[in-house]
Amino acid sequence: MTGFDRARIEAAVAEILAAVGEDPSRPGLSATPSRVADAYAEFFAGLGRDAEAELGEPVPLEQGQAETVILREISFRSVCEHHLLPFIGVAHVAYLPGEAVIGLGRIPRVIDTLAARPQVQERLTEQIADTFEAGAGARGVLVVLSAEHGCVTARGPRQVAATTVTLAARGEFAEPAARAELIALIGCGAA
């Protein structure tokens, strides 16, 4: 990650603690600025990284084109750029390979890279779909994310059971019939 300034983050966290009326040097809080900096280094590790590079080198198919590949229930976490609170959920990715396939382990790497930056779920969904369409040469892509947002569950409306579902479809999977079939296969309940 480029541009990560640990000292500034620690100073800013200490200032926030002081601004809410706490003593950042008291026992229990004295290490908090360092802990938050550690967490932010992890949360934002995708900044400056190329998600498409995470796809690796596609493996050419020996006999033309393959059928649909679906990887379901991929856990992810990101940080909402509006409140800097986490959103945590699962991703489902379906793609229709062109002349090559990508390693299944590469799919979560792409998601992790794109999620590890200040995000909104809607954009994250689109970025994942765009990465597979462009970087993997997929003829069709469908991405469904379902997540619980800290800004909905822990503050404001405090709806602890609320989930947000977003969907992005590209290529052949943008067709309504193909999209509906994949959603049924994924079994995630998205409309």
Swiss-Prot record:
<feature type="binding site">
    <location>
        <position position="83"/>
    </location>
    <ligand>
        <name>Zn(2+)</name>
    </ligand>
</feature>
<dbReference type="GO" id="GO:0006730">
    <property type="term" value="P:one-carbon metabolic process"/>
</dbReference>
<dbReference type="GO" id="GO:0005525">
    <property type="term" value="F:GTP binding"/>
</dbReference>
<keyword id="KW-0554">One-carbon metabolism</keyword>
<comment type="pathway">
    <text>Cofactor biosynthesis; 7,8-dihydroneopterin triphosphate biosynthesis; 7,8-dihydroneopterin triphosphate from GTP: step 1/1.</text>
</comment>
<dbReference type="GO" id="GO:0005737">
    <property type="term" value="C:cytoplasm"/>
</dbReference>
<dbReference type="GO" id="GO:0006729">
    <property type="term" value="P:tetrahydrobiopterin biosynthetic process"/>
</dbReference>
<feature type="binding site">
    <location>
        <position position="80"/>
    </location>
    <ligand>
        <name>Zn(2+)</name>
    </ligand>
</feature>
<dbReference type="InterPro" id="IPR001474">
    <property type="entry name" value="GTP_CycHdrlase_I"/>
</dbReference>
<dbReference type="InterPro" id="IPR043133">
    <property type="entry name" value="GTP-CH-I_C/QueF"/>
</dbReference>
<feature type="binding site">
    <location>
        <position position="151"/>
    </location>
    <ligand>
        <name>Zn(2+)</name>
    </ligand>
</feature>
<comment type="subunit">
    <text>Toroid-shaped homodecamer, composed of two pentamers of five dimers.</text>
</comment>
<dbReference type="GO" id="GO:0003934">
    <property type="term" value="F:GTP cyclohydrolase I activity"/>
</dbReference>
<keyword id="KW-0342">GTP-binding</keyword>
<dbReference type="GO" id="GO:0046654">
    <property type="term" value="P:tetrahydrofolate biosynthetic process"/>
</dbReference>
<dbReference type="InterPro" id="IPR020602">
    <property type="entry name" value="GTP_CycHdrlase_I_dom"/>
</dbReference>
<keyword id="KW-0378">Hydrolase</keyword>
<dbReference type="GO" id="GO:0008270">
    <property type="term" value="F:zinc ion binding"/>
</dbReference>
<keyword id="KW-0479">Metal-binding</keyword>
<protein>
    <recommendedName>
        <fullName>GTP cyclohydrolase 1</fullName>
        <ecNumber>3.5.4.16</ecNumber>
    </recommendedName>
</protein>
<comment type="similarity">
    <text>Belongs to the GTP cyclohydrolase I family.</text>
</comment>
<dbReference type="InterPro" id="IPR018234">
    <property type="entry name" value="GTP_CycHdrlase_I_CS"/>
</dbReference>
<dbReference type="InterPro" id="IPR043134">
    <property type="entry name" value="GTP-CH-I_N"/>
</dbReference>
<keyword id="KW-0547">Nucleotide-binding</keyword>
<keyword id="KW-0862">Zinc</keyword>
<dbReference type="Pfam" id="PF01227">
    <property type="entry name" value="GTP_cyclohydroI"/>
</dbReference>
